[in-house]
């Protein structure tokens, strides 16, 4: 009986805690965030960039990391501000203005042999029917897989797409 109790306790402990291996590796990729008109905080986009983007909103992209132990991707470092990105861009009849921010992430995520580009903030004037991917494509050069998964923005990273990597030290939760 004692053996069965010890076995059950060990089994439950194994199933209830994330494995060290799951916390040791994760994925670096482009995270997608949105800020509705007037919002000052990022919201992780629960859909891909194939949604209609509202006039006055800000679209954010961040080269980020996550794994089982760190499920939430980091949003762009700079808070969304439509007025600071698009304040000097005049409204155009029949079009919409969208702020776009591209944060190329922490240097610990940088692929070997590449340089981390500077943050991009750009105001895009787009057709009223433009989707998030259309707006992004007006702001930067987009490289995507056939499935639509975003692999690179403005050539960063140069070749990889959603690569598995060891968890960077700064991301490990203590």
Each language-model region and where it sits:
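Ubiquitin-like/PB1-type beta-grasp interaction modules and other compact soluble beta-rich domains
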Residues: 2, 18-174
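Sec-dependent N-terminal signal peptides
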Residues: 5-14, 20
